[in-house]
Structures are given as structure tokens and as C-alpha cells.
Amino acid sequence: MATTYRICPRSGLQFDTEAEKLMRWHAVAGVLSLLVGGIMALGVILTRWPAVKLLPADTFYMVLTAHGIDMLIFWIIFFEMAVLIFASSTLLHCRLATPKLAWLSSWLMVLGAIMTNVAIFQGESSVMFTSYVPMQAKPHFYLGLILFAVGALINCFIFLGTLVVAKAEKTYEGSIPLVTFGALTACIIAIFTIASGAIILIPTFFWSIGYIREIDSLMYRVVWWGLGHSSQQINVSAHVAIWYAIAAIVFGAKPMSEKVSRTAYFLYILFLQLASAHHILSDPGLSSEWKIVNTSYFMYFAVLASMIHGMTVPGAIEQAQRLKGYNKGLFEWLRKAPWGNPAFSSMFLSLIGFGFLGGISGVMMGAEQLNMLIHNTIYVPGHFHATVVIGTTLAFMGLTYFLVPVLFKRELMFPGYAKLFPYLFGLSMYMVALVMMGAGTLGVSRRHWDMAFAGSGMAYEWPGAAYLMMGLTGIFGVIAVVSGGLWILQIVFSILLGKKLEEGETRSTPIPLTLPAPTTGSHVHPPATPGTMVLALIFLTAFILYYFVNWKYLSSLWGLA
């Protein structure tokens, strides 16, 4: 089949028509997974809300299992596969490598997702997202995850193959664009992640059908977190790439320093997946030396990388705005930003929430001693709702507002809600993350369906503040789920019923990518970014204060005299 290319008249982007179909396929599969996970989230929220306690224990753990897997694995990775295709074939103006194999891998992912969900909803695989042994799920639970992982792994290699095609056919000159470099980082981490999953899930599958007698539980936890937490590091690389992409789309912003941003991505490859260690700091099978090295020296390099991105993205926006004349004071560039554009507002709320809530709490959780304060409490899901929901999901949702007219060729319906959505969903998730972390600091359990332990022989009375925070988790969680559900309806209605837009020119050969020539001349200087510097100092101040408060809290609980 001859390759054809569509030139989008609204964005100027060039799509390999087969790659375009695959992007739509993955985006739709991701949104369907988000729908299932969101419905399950409502059940989780209304059960953990002490005044409601909706579901009985067995149903709650089934719902919690589906929520975790559909949100943290299926929704995120489906969308990331669309991002990989976009960042390679579209941004590099080339054909997709092996489209038939790409379709096969995509079908494997869908089949795996369906198989695992069927196993969960049959009610005998309520092992939760972590699926720790010796808890055993049905064989098709593990088989579904394996098929999904194989499909995703094939897609990763197709992405790498597409980069080779672009280089061989000379569709671009020089280095790949920064967004593509970010996607390459995500791909490399994904290969490590999926390999970790295969190493542990394949023998666990054989254990579930009786071919292997037992799986060592400590070994399982160590290897599984190479999948469980590293899959979230794919998210970080992908959503940071989306931050850069939206900054370029909305403002025409250019990175403050390509070399610095690429170096930060390289630090992700070397050190980011080591953050998995904070999940197993209480495990006896690992040496103190290993724990200390991974949760201090190595992890700090990954933190440094995120702080670099957290400064260069708003810095690039500030430079672009100041070049347009928004130079009054420290923050006119930010005040005059297009806050009514949902792509921008989603991205900026994602950036702030990921840094201040997810980043700071993640470093605190990753410190071996401080981890004892919140290990296995509801602080942990509070942290990853700040990273995965606010950081990743909100960024993906913001990009979708750009993709509806460009990729799906439909006019967005309900534009008024689009302006409201980032604030309704984003700020409610800010509150969910904050009050979850507050309740976790008071010791509320991470997963127990009834925080009051009703009927227990050793009941425990929590302080009133803990019940208040769990109640607020319920209130703001419902707001977030409802607003997210309305977003899904808006996107589905737009794709199915929105006004059809002009498709654009179709060509049989790609137009080579031409990057703007670098500006020469000693008289040209990018504008200073004092506003970004102030934001960075505010972040560092909050970081230091929160770190100090937690060490002070630990010292009050763990007296040495």
C-alpha cells in the first residue's frame, strides 16, 4: 500500500495517513480506559468517605483493582503510544515504520486490556494494582497484562524504527526536535519498564496455572516495582514533552537551552526509575547501603532533571511573551497569558501541581528516614494523584483539545466548558492530593476500605482532623470525577457530532522538515526571565520548609533521648 500524507490546514502538521489512524485508535482506546477507571474512582471515593462507605469490602477491592490498572496502566500507556507515533512520524515528516505490525501490536494491547478487565470484574482477581503474591489472580488477569505489555513493547520498537526511517530518508537535518527527544526518553524507559514486567509477570502467570510451585514474595516486590513505578516515569518524560509542545503551539516558545533540556532528559534515563526504591524501603531483603544510595544520591539527579524542566518551560513562555511586549513588572507575561485556552491552562496547572505537590512530596517520600512517616498510608496515593492525575492526565487532556480539530478534524463542541474544565478538574484534584497527604500524615491507611476498623477487636480512634480530611477527599473527589466525566462526554460528542473541518491537501511524498535557522549576531539576546526566577525561588522555599517540617515531625515521634 502506497504511503500518503495529509497536510493539516489548521496546524501545518503533516500526517502519514496510516499513522494518523493509529493515533486516533490509541487515543480512543485510552479515553475508554479512562472512562472505566473514572467510574471505578467514584466507587473508591464514596467508599473511603467515612460518612458514605458505599461498597462492601470485597466489591471495594475489585473496584480498586480496576481503578488502578485502568488508570495507571491502560489509559496512560494507550495515550503515550499515540504520543510516540505523533512525535516520530508527524514531527519528523516521515512515514511510519511497519504499519501492519503497528496495527497488530495495537490489537494486542486492546485484547490484553479487555482480558485483564474481564478477569477483574469476574470478581476473583481483586489483587489490586500491585498484585502482590501470594495473592493469586486468575490466569487471564496476568495473560492480559502480558499481551498488553508485548503490544506496547512492539510499538516502542516501531517508534525507534520510525526514527531510523526519518534519518535514512533525510526528512530532517541535525538533531531530532526536543519533543521527539522527550518521547525517545519515554520510549527507552518504557522498554526497561516492560522488560521488568515480563521478568516477573510471565513466571507469575505460570504460577497461577500451576506450572511453578511458588514465587518469592520479596523478589516479586523488588522486580514488580521496576514495572509499577517505572511506568510512571514514562509518564513524566511524556508529559514534560507535552509541556514543551504546548508552549510551542500556544506561544511559539523555544526552549531556553536545548542542551540543558536534553541533558535533563538524559538524567531521567539514568536515574529516574530508581525512585521505585521508595516503595520497598521497609522490605528486609535489601541492604541499608542500597536503600541509602538509591534514595539519596541517585534520586537527587532525577529531582534535578525535573526542576530543570520546571524552570525552562515557564522560562521559555516568559521569553516568548516578553518578545511580544509583555514586559511590565515581574508577571505581566503570566497575567496576559491565554488563560481561557484550555490547552495552556491545563498545561500550566499540570506543571505547578506536579512540581509543588507531586515533586516535593515525592522527594520527601523518597528519603529513607522520612518515608517511615507515611509508608503504606493514604499519603502515597495522594502523592501519585498529584503526579499522575495532575501532572500527566491533565497535560494529556489539555493536548486533546488541540488534537480534536487537528487529528480528528472536528470542531470542538461546548467551548465554554473547555475554558472551565482545567480549573474545575485541576483545582479539585489539587485538593484531593492535599487532603489525602494530610490524612496520610495522620496515619490513615492506604487501602483499608473502612478507616474506622468497625467491628475490629482492636479499634483505633482517629483524630477528628483525619475524618475531616477523608470527608474532603470524598467531596473534591466527586467533583473531579464528574468534571472528568463531562470532559469525556465533550470529547466524544465533538468527535462523533462536531462539525467536520477541512481535511487539507493529500500528498504521495512527504515535505521535508525545515527547522528555523539559528539567529546570528552578538546584538541579539533573549530577554531575561525574572518572573520565572521568582517562581523558582518560591518553589525552593516551599521545598525547604516542607522538608524541614517533616524532619521536625519525625524527631517528635522518634525521640533519641
Where are the regions that the model predicts?
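Juxtamembrane cytosolic/matrix-side boundary and N-terminal portion
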Residues: 521-540
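Membrane-embedded and interfacial regions of multi-pass energy-transducing membrane proteins
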Residues: 2-514, 532
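Homeobox/homeodomain signature
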Residues: 374-376, 519, 544
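Short, membrane-interfacial amphipathic segments enriched in basic
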Residues: 213, 518-523
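Final/C-terminal transmembrane alpha-helix of multipass membrane proteins
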Residues: 348, 427, 534-550
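Juxtamembrane boundary at the C-terminal end of a transmembrane helix
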Residues: 546-561
